[in-house]
Amino acid sequence: MTRYFLAVHTRPTPGRETEYHRWYDDFHLDEVLQVPDFVTAERHVLVQSEGAQLLGPGSHLAVFTITSDDIDATMTAFRHAQKSMARPACLDADSVALSWWRPLGSRTASSSPLVPDSA
């Protein structure tokens, strides 16, 4: 099985932030996790700091982990499931942007040759 990620940028409709968070946490994450091969869901919010730039159309990011031997079939299943997923008014529809990712490599500080050994 190969691991993939679906990144979804969104933002709440102004003035409906509480409703947006409730919908996402109490309903939508579980709705997406019902799609075959989707195994984890994690939400993030943009950290506002000096010089921070918005890299996507939304201030919020959901990252879904997928494990699949056939990502094309998984993507098709997701698109089919999307047709019945709720799009509540608390979600700014213009902010929704999806992108699919496949890891190219990974490293931890403990395995990096540039990080000094603490021993």
What is each residue range found by the language model?
Residues 1-119:
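Macromolecular interaction modules
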